UniProtKB/Swiss-Prot annotation:
GO terms for molecular function: ATP binding; magnesium ion binding; methionine adenosyltransferase activity. Residues 98-108 are annotated as: Flexible loop. The gene is metK. ATP binds at residues 14, 174-176, 240-241, 249, 255-256, 272, 276. Homotetramer; dimer of dimers. It comes from Caldicellulosiruptor saccharolyticus (strain ATCC 43494 / DSM 8903 / Tp8T 6331). Transmembrane segments: none annotated. Keywords: ATP-binding, Cytoplasm, Magnesium, Metal-binding, Nucleotide-binding, One-carbon metabolism, Potassium, Transferase. The lineage of its organism: Bacteria, Bacillati, Bacillota, Bacillota incertae sedis, Caldicellulosiruptorales. The keyword Oxidoreductase does not apply. Belongs to the AdoMet synthase family. This is S-adenosylmethionine synthase.
Length: 396
């Protein structure tokens, strides 16, 4: 049976992604000086204005307006005619401390208060919020990500590369990509449709943009065997994309959660990542769920695997662990879930310890996806639990 699936990505200059990157740049700057800081940093951007807000509890000082301007400059917004200017935009900050009502549950988990866990056992911290988190992996690509989002991210990164490298100097920072993949019997066989929308200078013609993007962006990224004469390609389908960035649309942190994860191919718990320190399970437990799912697929126990975790605020142990292999598992999903419980410690402090999350590693994942990153050595992307998973599978 044939079916189509579509995923999108955005470039680092997309207004929402500007916000994600500033949020994580602030987080990184704080973690570099104070690894145990509590950070929840949100950003909004609009024409000529950046608003940085949130709750931060830390012993250190960081220059938030400078961090915001530096991030905007790195993205490429250096002139007002691009839609934003790092040097002339206004930066407003509104920062409070973390609520003491939240802090009391994170500082000491319910289990520790009840004497079920010692204070010094992996810090004995509770989850920073309730909620459910999903992780996913599949064998469609070398990085065990779904093909549509994998290709959409690569196209978006290529847009930034040809812009910053001067290959297509008329491009500007804002842009989006979208890829529709055709599947036969659940395996990707071809790319059905590609959409690329990229901001550009007013002088360049649509025909030139179309030809250049096909030659310098699409052809180097999409595998030749995945393109055919029936593949539909749309480049700037409105015909013009000069006004972009925060001048074209306002932006907010956490508004691209599907781009950040699996492109809609797997379920999502609803929590965003950027600007949150690792005591927030929205971030750390979603990373852990990906780590679990990827190791299960890498071990060959399934072709596809989705892991759901759930937490209560102030409680360390996950309330539930669910595994779904969509009928591709070599053993029952319930048995795989038992293996997960034996192999992975999914309490927040253990996740932070095992994935070494109290480091300034977040800004670089704030654009082009948090998962399946071939360009980064991310701890949640490692497949170092394969051997122990296979050993446990033999004993079950």
């Amino acid at each position: 049976m044939r079916k189509l699936f579509t995923s999108e990505s955005v470039t680092e200059g997309h207004p929402d992604k500007i916000c994600d990157q500033i949020s994580d740049a602030v987080l990184d700057a704080i973690l570099e000086k104070d690894p145990y800081a509590r950070v929840a940093c949100e950003v909004a951007v609009t024409t000529g204005l950046v608003l940085v807000m949130g709750e931060i509890t830390t012993k250190c000082y960081v220059d938030i307006p400078k961090i915001a301007r530096d991030t905007i400059r790195e993205i490429g917004y250096t002139r007002a005619k691009y839609g934003f200017d790092a040097d002339t935009c206004a930066v407003i900050t509104s920062i409070d401390e973390q609520s003491p009502d939240i802090a009391m549950g994170v500082d000491k988990a319910l289990e520790a208060k009840l004497g079920e866990m010692t204070d010094d056992e992996i810090e004995a911290i509770g989850a920073g919020d309730q909620g459910m988190m999903f992780g996913f992996a599949c064998d469609e690509t070398p990085v065990l990500m779904p093909m549509p989002i994998y290709l959409a991210h690569k196209l978006a990164r290529r847009l930034a590369y040809v812009r910053k490298g001067g290959i297509l100097p008329y491009l500007r920072p804002d842009g989006k990509t979208q890829v529709t993949v055709e599947y036969e019997d659940d395996r990707p066989i071809r790319v059905d449709t590609i959409v690329v929308s990229t901001q550009h200078s007013p002088e360049v013609t649509h025909a030139q943009i179309e030809a250049d993007v096909i030659e310098h962006v699409i052809k180097p990224i999409i595998p030749e065997g995945m393109l055919d004469k029936n593949t539909k390609i749309y480049i700037n389908p409105t015909g013009r994309f000069v006004i972009g960035g925060p001048q074209g649309d306002s932006g907010l942190t956490g508004r691209k959660i599907i781009v950040d994860t699996y492109g809609g191919y797997a379920r999502h718990g609803g929590g965003a990542f950027s600007g949150k320190d690792p005591t927030k399970v929205d971030r750390s437990a979603t990373y852990a769920a990906r780590y679990v799912a990827k190791n299960i697929v890498a071990a060959g126990l399934a072709k596809k695997c989705e892991v759901q975790l759930s937490y209560a605020i102030g409680v360390a142990r996950p309330l539930s662990i669910r595994v779904d292999t969509f009928g591709t598992g070599k053993i029952d999903d319930e048995k795989i879930a038992e293996i997960v419980k034996r192999v992975f410690d999914l309490r927040p402090a253990a996740i932070i310890r095992d994935l070494d999350l109290r480091r300034p590693i977040y800004k670089k994942v704030a654009a082009y996806g948090h998962f399946g990153r071939e360009d980064l050595d991310l701890p949640w992307e490692r497949t170092d639990k394969v051997d122990i998973i296979l050993k446990e599978a033999q004993n079950i």
